């Protein structure tokens, strides 16, 4: 697999790279739809979500995995959303149609890159979509874990413990990586404490 650092750009190639960077830069301005639908103020962007996922891929221990590949998967897995937007379950778009739109978007995005990078980024996206490797399965759990961590943070910021329970419900039973299970357990314990404390406070 070619390394991203191996590519060189000049002339027309540099213009295409600039176009690619502007395109993926739109992810900074694509809000995560689930938060929008729940009326979260100043919801995070898709880029925000993928950044913390990439950090999680770096720091959550698993010597059996290719961690460099995990980071790359985290950075690419939602890249198509710079064109198609963040399609949420509440949008009621069939999974096959969502995949078709994102596949077309990834082909459009990667067309701006040299052949080796085009192949690498598209194959990373496809690997995540098909969950065809241990690394892809790990990153999928990071995706879910990052989401509920963000939900907890929004509850804290709003001083409304438990308001985003449906995000937790949607991930029930989906974690099996030992380190992620431990992290989720700690998060849920903290959150349960906050919910209990809020329930015991006298209401004015």
Curated annotation (Swiss-Prot):
Q: Which GO terms describe its molecular function?
A: 5'-deoxynucleotidase activity; metal ion binding
Q: Which residues bind a divalent metal cation 2?
A: 81, 86-87
Catalyses which reaction(s): a 2'-deoxyribonucleoside 5'-phosphate + H2O = a 2'-deoxyribonucleoside + phosphate
The coenzyme or cofactor needed here is: Mn(2+); Co(2+); Mg(2+)
The UniProt record gives the binding positions of a divalent metal cation 1 as 49, 77-78, 143
Q: Sorted alphabetically, which PROSITE patterns does this protein's record hold?
A: HD
Quote the record's cofactor note: Binds 2 divalent metal cations. Shows activity with Mn(2+), Co(2+) and Mg(2+) but shows no activity with Zn(2+).
Cross-referenced Pfam families, in alphabetical order?
HD_3
**Which residues in this protein are found as Phosphoserine?**
3, 5, 204
Per UniProt, which keywords does this protein have?
Answer: Acetylation, Cobalt, Hydrolase, Magnesium, Manganese, Metal-binding, Phosphoprotein
- What is known about what this protein does? Catalyzes the dephosphorylation of the nucleoside 5'-monophosphates deoxyadenosine monophosphate (dAMP), deoxycytidine monophosphate (dCMP), deoxyguanosine monophosphate (dGMP) and deoxythymidine monophosphate (dTMP).
Oligomer status and interactors: Homodimer.
Q: Which family does it belong to?
A: Belongs to the HDDC2 family.
Provide the protein name. 5'-deoxynucleotidase HDDC2
């Amino acid at each position: 697999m070619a390394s991203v650092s191996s590519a060189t750009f000049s002339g027309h190639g540099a213009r295409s790279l600039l176009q690619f960077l502007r395109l993926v830069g739109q992810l900074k301005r694509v809000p995560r739809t689930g938060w929008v639908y729940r009326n979260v103020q100043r919801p995070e962007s898709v880029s925000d979500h993928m950044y913390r996922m990439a950090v999680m891929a770096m720091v959550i221990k698993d010597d059996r995995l290719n961690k460099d590949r995990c980071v790359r998967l985290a950075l690419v897995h939602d890249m198509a959303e710079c064109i198609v937007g963040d399609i949420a379950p509440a949008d009621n778009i069939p999974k096959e149609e969502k995949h078709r739109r994102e596949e077309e978007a990834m082909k459009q995005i990667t067309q701006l890159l040299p052949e080796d990078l085009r192949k690498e980024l598209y194959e990373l996206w496809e690997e995540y979509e098909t969950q065809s490797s241990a690394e892809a399965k790990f990153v999928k759990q990071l995706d879910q874990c990052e989401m509920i961590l963000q939900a907890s943070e929004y509850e804290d910021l709003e001083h409304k413990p438990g308001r985003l329970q449906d995000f937790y419900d949607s991930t029930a039973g989906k974690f099996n990586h030992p380190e992620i299970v431990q992290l989720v357990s700690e998060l849920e314990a903290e959150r349960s404490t906050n919910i209990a404390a809020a329930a015991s406070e006298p209401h004015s």
